[in-house]
Amino acid sequence: MKNRIKKGSSMIGVYGRSDGSSSIQSSNGSESRESIDDNKQGHQSLVEWLNETLPYLNLPWEASEEELRACLVDGTVLCNLLNQLSPGSMRMGGSFEPGCVNIERFLAAMDEMTLPRFEVSDLEQGDMIRVIQSLKALKASFSDDGYDKNTLSARRRWSLPADHSKGVDSNFNDGGSQFIEASEINTSHHSLQNTSTRSLFDMLDRLLDESSQKMNVSHVYVSILRGIVQVVEQRISNQAENLKNQNILFRVREEKYRSRINVLETLASGTTDENEVRRKRCAPNRKGKERSNAELSKLKQELEIVKETHEKQFLELKLNAQKAKVELERQVKNSELRVVEAKELEKLCETKTKRWEKKEQTYKRFINHQTEALQELKATSMSLKHDVLKIGENYFLDLTYYGIKLRGVAHAAKNYQIIIEENRRLYNEVQELKGNIRVYCRIRPFLQGQNKKQTSIEYTGENGELVVANPLKQGKDTYRLFKFNKVFGPESTQEEVFLDTRPMIRSILDGYNVCIFAYGQTGSGKTYTMSGPSITSEEDRGVNYRALNDLFHLTQSRQNSVMYEVGVQMVEIYNEQVRDLLSQDVPDASMHSVRSTEDVLELMNIGLMNRTVGATTLNEKSSRSHSVLSVHVRGVDVKTESVLRGSLHLVDLAGSERVGRSEVTGERLKEAQHINKSLSALGDVIFALAHKNPHVPYRNSKLTQVLQNSLGGQAKTLMFVQINPDEDSYAETVSTLKFAERVSGVELGAARSYKEGRDVRQLMEQVSNLKDMIAKKDEELQKFQNINGIQKRGLSKLRIVSPPRRHSLGGALTNSPRRRQGPGLLGRTTSDIHRHQNESRSSSKFSGGAKDNNIFEDTELLGFEESNNEERLSDISDSCLSMGTETDGSISSGAMELTLFPETSNPPEMFEQSEQNDKAHVGVGPSKPLKHTPKPDISKPSRLSISTTSSKALTSSKRPVTGISSSVKPLNRKR
């Protein structure tokens, strides 16, 4: 044992890296073997060996695997352990390197020493068995039993790189035979790294002696000297680090042993058995202390050597300091030059200071002059102050006088506001008496994604003023002013819009006819105002539902005095064709009786689903047809049994659109053309009504025919003008507002209520009976015409004009059994025509005309002579409908409804209306002018009716047959 310690200490003395560590390992190995024998070679022996090798760890003897893992996981302890066992073998990196790099270095060293290794994952989160086995193998390899030549050679190969040994060998081969020691080192398998320090110094002495003798040193010698010096320097530096570590180790061990001795001394008063055990435990510690003292003395000697090296380094630092002093002197000279420059700048500053002093004197003189001027101004201001006080007193007197006058003006202003409200009320009453079409303008808010766009709406007033701005023009042409009955801003709700229309809608129950229609470009919110985006949401419901809901509440509140019946029709005008939206299997427009709001919701849902809707660039849900919701109300007074009839037409017009912006093609282009055509026809009608032209072109479109009684009759009419505030739609907005301005100037006449008593109903029944008798006589006349052969020629021409099938709006009336036998309005209109034929025939007899001529005239009236007679008959029916408004506007409205939307079975309440129509139309004259003969006193027709129908007959003979009067087949809707 002592020989091994001496061997290890001798190797440390000659600075051998592997030898120096072997003595520590041998001593540690003996201690570890003793601890293994004491603890049965368990886990505690490994922990004790680690604490002894690296004292700063201070691991507890009973440390668990997790504590051991936490100590070894960063790899620093492993690398320090290997450096402690073999000093200088591991080069530690900086603190910035991760722990896995140190672990990889340790594992690479274990592979070079051919020792069992472990994986990085085992140390991080795996089983610690392989780690413990690897550490035990490392411990055994550096112990006394494992200290053999193979292990030593393996450690030496691991300590010195192969390229370095090869380089040194090559340098020694170039040395020649002059140095036997160098050649011997080269021929051996050991490098300079494995040579002892003493031999290296001897070799250096011999080289120096040889060089001093010959004074001729070759490159080989120089390289050898450099290699020797580098190895010596490296060993000395490593040894210094080892000395520091060992010194710390010895101090820690000494403190540890002292603490143990103190503990043992305090426990000496215990039992003898415990003292014996403690003595046994302290015995190896004492031996270790003796060994450490011996090692400490050796380390002190080595420390002196290191001290000499530090003195050499101090000399070098002193030389460097001298060089730095020279550099500092050079910098001092530069600073002196800068001081000279600073003095020159100081002189320059002095000259500038003198210049500023001169300026200061001039400024002082100027200030003194200004001070004198200010004193003069002060005296002047004092005089002005006295004048101002006098003027203030005068103003106070004037203000008190004007205040007294202003009180009277304020009192007059209050009365002026009352007068303005009264004038506004009277103006509305005058407008209602004149029958002007009311125009409400509603501005659609910006949609999502359009908030950043600039608006073309400049101002909206409370009294219906609207100012729009043209973004493309500047100056006085930028703004345009329009005035309407009401203007709703983008923030207005559906409830606010309906509250202004409620009084007009409620007048239906009093027997008035009301029409509300929405006009504007596509995507401006017409359908939103009339129907709403969702019927299920009460806040978003439009005028249609709110109007019907309000009517139901009124009918329920008045049910004790008046019994009401409400019927609903909903149609659309699609491509100049009328379609029923509430039923598809009925050829004509169907009337549906409703009794509650639930019925209305169901019907409106059906109508909205059946309505034609398409997507365009401007609007994803663009309405491609005009929607008409007609509400017919019939009320019977419980006491007087008088009948009230009113109708409400809620029209949602399709939006006008520019093909260039909407980018429609194909079927959508055709729809847009029909929509624009019908809206253009509506504009022509408005233009004619505004200028009070004698001829109004209602027949140019199905839309104008539907709105004929609302625009030209004595009904209450309201138009919603929907506009888009986007500046890109400025042209469409101005066009829409101009149209609305023309509409607001149309006078319809005072609206009248339709109310008939019991006597009127009896007279109408008598008239209907007389008409039935006339119809029978007309049939006998037709048989007589067939006998004379005229029927054949008339039928052939009729076949050319129009096939015998169901007619559409304004078409010629066929002589079908249903039309002939039914008591409706159309059959009675035909009987009126035959009655006029009889009157014409009787008048021709008084004039002495031929019988054949009368027959031909009757044939022309029936439509068997000329192709344009079909239109003439429709003109006669239109004249009957329009002229009836002279006596009662609601009668013509009901007649128009039945003419446009005939039903398979007319409701009973419509019979009385048709009888009243017949009574009003008794005086309608023939469509073709007769010969100038005195007329009998059988009937006295109205002058206005005769003149109007005769003028229509004259003009219709020159016009070609239009598509409006042609018959159409029942519509097959394709969705």
From Swiss-Prot:
Give the residue ranges for region: Disordered. Answer: 1-40, 801-852, 900-975
Task: One GO cellular component term, please give it.
Answer: microtubule
Where is composition skewed (Basic and acidic residues) in this entry?
Answer: 31-40
Q: Please list the residue ranges annotated as the Calponin-homology (CH) domain.
A: 40-143
Q: Does the keyword Lipid metabolism apply?
A: no
Pfam families reported in the protein's UniProt record: CH, Kinesin
> Gene3D superfamilies under this entry?
Calponin-like domain, Kinesin motor domain
Q: Which GO terms describe its biological process?
A: microtubule-based movement; microtubule-based process
Q: Does the keyword Nucleotide-binding apply?
A: yes
Q: List the biased-composition ranges (Low complexity).
A: 17-30, 944-958
- Judging by the UniProt lineage, the source's domain of life is Eukaryota
InterPro entries cross-referenced by the UniProt entry: CH_dom (IPR001715), CH_dom_sf (IPR036872), Kinesin-like_fam (IPR027640), Kinesin_motor_CS (IPR019821), Kinesin_motor_dom (IPR001752), Kinesin_motor_dom_sf (IPR036961), P-loop_NTPase (IPR027417)
Annotated coiled-coil segments of the chain: 289-345, 757-788
The segment(s) forming the Kinesin motor domain are 436-746
- What Gene Ontology terms describe what this protein does at the molecular function level? ATP binding; microtubule binding; microtubule motor activity
Q: Which SMART domains match?
A: CH (SM00033), KISc (SM00129)
Q: Which keywords, in A-to-Z order, does the entry hold?
A: ATP-binding, Coiled coil, Microtubule, Motor protein, Nucleotide-binding
Family classification: Belongs to the TRAFAC class myosin-kinesin ATPase superfamily. Kinesin family. KIN-14 subfamily.
Full protein name: Kinesin-like protein KIN-14K
Q: List the source organism.
A: Arabidopsis thaliana (Mouse-ear cress)
